[in-house]
Amino acid sequence: RRRQRQMCIRDRYQKCVSMGVTFFDEFQVLDIKIDDGVCKGVVAYEIATGDIHVFEARAVTFATGGFGKIYKVSSNAHSLTGDGPGILYQKGIPLEDMEFYQFHPTGIYRLGILLSEAARGEGGILRNKDGERFMERYAPSIKDLAPRDMVSRAIATEISEGNGAGPNNDFVYLDLTHLGAETIKQKLPDITDFVRTYVKIEPIDEPIPVQPTAHYAMGGIPTDVDARVLSDANGTILPGVYSAGESACVSV
């Protein structure tokens, strides 16, 4: 999936270049200009020079991603602090579903680097400090293959009840050792590379310390199915303002 994302980004970038799109790299949007309820453009900060720029536009699309960096441990980039939703909130736009955030159950302890569900799909087992396969208690039929929310809650419960590992009892183990060296090398190469590089653990021989990691914002800027921003609970459209991707929220 990572390679697919890279290909998508490359193809979209090349398409923009072919259409003559101008990019303003390393600019930080500070504010949106709205006059009489209509979008007029944005105000941005040029990081390299410290200059403030005003961009006039009849339409603005917020695609600023999530806000995972409000959490201590997150898979998100450092830039994902909710600036897009924050700018519109300051303009009186009520944000939606902000209390809902997806936690990936198996981020590398303290680092937020995600270890794919493929590890558990291949037979990886989650264990607490005592070596117990605790998911048997939370999801007896599907065990470690339970959905993300169930597994994350189970890990959080184990930690809160004192069953976490380490000196602070704040992580559990993802155990791949029983899979064998060949299976791990052939089917889980990315995971093994991450673990060897960032925590200096050999997953063929040792279990991996993991913890629930803030991953995806369910809430954000309220939009309709056409990406148009809604300015109130009645679904009033804010002309010329759009949001797409993780910064947007169509609710459920």
For each feature predicted by the language model, list its residue ranges.
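Glycine-rich phosphate/pyrophosphate-binding beta-alpha loops
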Residues: 66, 103-108, 214, 247-252
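A glycine-rich dinucleotide-binding beta-alpha-beta segment and adjacent secondary-structure elements
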Residues: 24, 30-39, 44-45, 187-248
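Core beta-strand elements of the Rossmann-like FAD/NAD(P) dinucleotide-binding domain
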Residues: 48-59, 237-240
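A conserved beta-strand/loop element that lines the FAD pocket in flavoprotein oxidoreductases
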Residues: 17-29, 95-98
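Short, well-ordered coil/turn residues at beta-beta hairpins
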Residues: 57-59, 63-64, 244-245
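Flavin (primarily FAD) binding-site architecture
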Residues: 62-75
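Short, small-residue-biased leader/transition segments that mark boundaries at the very start
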Residues: 2-9
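An anion/pyrophosphate-binding glycine-rich loop and adjacent beta-alpha core
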Residues: 87, 93-202, 206-209
